[in-house]
Amino acid sequence: QEYLFGSRRPDERDRAHNARAIPPIVWAYWSGAAAPPLIARCFANWRQFNPHFSIRVLDDDSVRNYLGELPEALEHASATLRADWIRLELLRRHGGIWLDASTLLTAPLDWVLQQQQRSGSDLIAYYLDRYTTDAQFPIVENWFLAAPPQSALVADLQHEFTHTVLPLGGAGY
């Protein structure tokens, strides 16, 4: 099911359809040692289905090429919390598609770019129907997120994450 959040007036819909496009970039992050064979096969799967996309699998060193220095609060954070911050910051700055490393594709990702161009959405994502109690506010999964650069929604999420989640830690939030 497709959701458009908020009550958009016609002039807002026009602006949305002029939104910047999601670039054909797939982002992922792997912390620590080399990825195990299963994860390496997932990365190969992405390249096989999407030869025209830039597939960027980052580690603790290469992530700095795209984001510069990371917040001090991430130095001792869990790999999960670190990846959560990195995914939002990459999408906020550069746009693209975030996939968790263990994601196996069954088709090319062109549909994501096409869907965003049709809808003008700030974010393409899956939601958890099981936990969504109000259809106006679905619980969005973060293993797959796609956004244009400077997405207002992603910027808001990243601001909340940086200024609330990081100081409290994942469990405290």
List PLM regions with ranges:
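Substrate-binding rim/cap in mid-to-C-terminal beta-strand-loop elements of soluble/periplasmic
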Residues: Q136-Q158
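Structural recognition of the beta-strand scaffold that forms the well-ordered cores
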Residues: V57, I124-Y126, A146
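GT-A fold catalytic core of metal-dependent nucleotide-sugar glycosyltransferases
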Residues: L81-D129, T133-I139
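N-terminal anchoring/stem segment of glycosyltransferases
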Residues: Q1-E69
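Short, charged, amphipathic alpha-helices and their helix-cap/turn boundaries
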Residues: L58-E72, T106-W111, Q115, L153-D156
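Catalytic core and acceptor-binding pocket of nucleotide-sugar-dependent glycosyltransferases
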Residues: L153-Y173
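Short, solvent-exposed loop/turn segments at secondary-structure junctions
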Residues: S31-A34, D61-R64, T103-T106, R130-T132, ...
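Conserved interaction-surface patches within small, structured recognition/assembly domains
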Residues: G68-R82
